[in-house]
């Protein structure tokens, strides 16, 4: 086997690989020898068929496999010897197209190598860690929200208002005929909750207990029950009771409803939860600042193919966000802009840097972290958690999609430990502004 370099410009590499006919023949013989013990043929005992006969019978069929394995082996040896890591799958092309059995195989291989990522002194990176304390106002606001969620309804006299609860019997009809699922008795409906068909709840505002009212509505065009979608309906309603909302008293009893021993304990739990939320938001801000610093600080050549692929994906994603009515790929080719290319360069540079740093420092995603991530995703599919878990276990691509952000965050945390970080206490509003500013940046 002979490997000759034909191109070495920047990260672009090209090689000519020659596999001799003798090497190819040896590979065919090797595969036949592996299979020989299991082959049966008329006139011979199992495993005793002569090699010459096996070659005549099966040699031609094994030739293609032998060619592929020989070329793959040559590539693997080249990458081991050279230390190159291809950015994408190498392009392989057989150059002697008039090849026939008995000839040497001549192959052209080209690829872009991943660049050498320079070592970086992360102690020169200066970052600000924003700190927000949960003040009394924020805790009281959270308590008010909990009290609202724990509210009860008490019977009232007079007409129903927005926010009141009406207890109703109803019977729905389309074209004068009742339909399945369109009737209920003693149904508690909070007006303004938008839990019914659009236009339904508004028509019950102003009604009183004992009143009967026909509610005219139209089912949405995208209604889940296709036989009702877009159709006009009349609901015969009997208002049996009108109730006004009453917020829960913010006291020890309410605290117990939420699993706390008393009100002070609940306040402490709320404070901890709020500060955990603030810390998560502050980390996102600090991470963005870190990535901005690294994008400026660390420079190295980027594989053009990776940048082009990333730019194409960015352009495609943004186009679909701007044209949500278009599904699939039935649209004109989308050309990346200069802005897309700049964003792609940033993503590729940071991606290669973080990947290299994680590999050098043996940063890994643990099985426990993966399980936690899968379970968090599975909660989005109530009742189907087991099926989702099994689907992820059998899908390497989905596993990688879950693993990648965990790995990135662990590498970022590693850099945080090395960087020069100072704390700065700010208000909740200032933190909110800092988070909102992230959307305005790259």
Curated annotation (Swiss-Prot):
Gene3D superfamilies: 3.10.50.40, Trigger factor ribosome-binding domain (3.30.70.1050), Trigger factor, C-terminal domain (1.10.3120.10). Its EC number is 5.2.1.8. Keywords: Cell cycle, Cell division, Chaperone, Cytoplasm, Isomerase, Rotamase. PROSITE patterns: FKBP_PPIASE (PS50059). It holds the Pfam family Trigger_C. Residues 163-248 form the PPIase FKBP-type domain. It comes from the Bacteria. It is an enzyme of class 5 (isomerase). GO terms for molecular function: peptidyl-prolyl cis-trans isomerase activity. Coiled coil: none annotated. It catalyses: [protein]-peptidylproline (omega=180) = [protein]-peptidylproline (omega=0). GO terms for biological process: cell division; protein folding; protein transport. It is found in: Cytoplasm. The keyword Magnesium does not apply. One of its GO terms (cellular component) is cytoplasm. Involved in protein export. Acts as a chaperone by maintaining the newly synthesized protein in an open conformation. Functions as a peptidyl-prolyl cis-trans isomerase. Belongs to the FKBP-type PPIase family. Tig subfamily. HAMAP family: Trigger_factor_Tig (MF_00303). Consists of 3 domains; the N-terminus binds the ribosome, the middle domain has PPIase activity, while the C-terminus has intrinsic chaperone activity on its own. This is Trigger factor.
């Amino acid at each position: 086997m002979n490997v000759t370099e034909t191109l070495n410009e920047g990260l672009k590499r090209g090689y000519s690989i020659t596999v001799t006919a003798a090497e190819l023949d040896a590979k065919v013989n090797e595969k036949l020898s592996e299979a020989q013990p299991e082959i049966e043929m008329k006139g011979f005992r199992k495993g005793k068929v002569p090699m010459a006969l096996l070659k005549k019978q099966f040699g031609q069929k094994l030739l293609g496999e032998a060619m592929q394995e020989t070329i793959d082996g040559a590539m693997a040896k080249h990458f081991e010897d050279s230390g190159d890591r291809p950015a994408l799958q190498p392009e392989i092309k057989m150059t002697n197209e008039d090849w026939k059995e008995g000839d040497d195989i001549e192959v052209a291989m080209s690829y872009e190598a991943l660049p050498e990522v320079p070592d970086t002194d992360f102690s020169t990176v200066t970052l600000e860690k924003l700190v927000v304390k949960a003040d009394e106002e924020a805790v009281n606001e959270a308590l008010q929200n909990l009290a609202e969620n724990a509210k009860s309804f008490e019977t009232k006299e007079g007409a129903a208002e927005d926010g009141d609860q009406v207890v109703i019997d109803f019977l729905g009809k389309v074209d004068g005929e009742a339909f399945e699922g369109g009737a209920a008795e003693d149904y508690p409906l909070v007006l303004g909750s938008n839990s019914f068909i659009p236009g339904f709840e508004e028509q019950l505002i102003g009604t009183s207990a004992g009143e009967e009212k026909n509610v005219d509505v139209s089912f949405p065009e995208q209604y889940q029950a296709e036989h009702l979608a877009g159709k006009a309906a009349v609901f015969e309603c009997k208002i049996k009771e009108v109730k006004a909302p009453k917020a829960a008293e913010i006291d020890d009893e309410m605290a117990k409803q939420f699993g706390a021993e008393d009100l002070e304990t609940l306040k402490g739990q709320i404070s901890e939860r709020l500060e955990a939320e603030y810390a998560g938001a502050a980390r996102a801000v600090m991470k963005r600042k870190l990535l901005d610093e690294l994008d400026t600080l660390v420079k190295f050549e980027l594989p053009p193919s990776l940048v082009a692929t990333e730019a194409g994906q960015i352009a495609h994603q943004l186009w679909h966000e701007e044209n949500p009515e278009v599904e699939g790929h039935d649209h004109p080719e989308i050309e990346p802009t200069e802005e897309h290319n700049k964003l792609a360069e940033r993503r590729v540079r940071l991606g290669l840097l973080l990947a290299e740093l994680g590999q050098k420092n043996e940063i890994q995603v643990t099985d426990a972290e993966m399980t936690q991530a899968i379970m968090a995703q599975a909660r989005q599919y109530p009742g189907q958690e087991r099926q989702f878990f099994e689907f992820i276990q059998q899908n390497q691509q989905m596993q990688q999609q879950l693993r990648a952000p965990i790995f990135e965050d662990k590498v970022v945390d590693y850099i945080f430990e090395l960087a020069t970080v100072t704390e700065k206490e700010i208000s909740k509003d200032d933190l909110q502004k800092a988070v909102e500013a992230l959307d305005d940046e790259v």
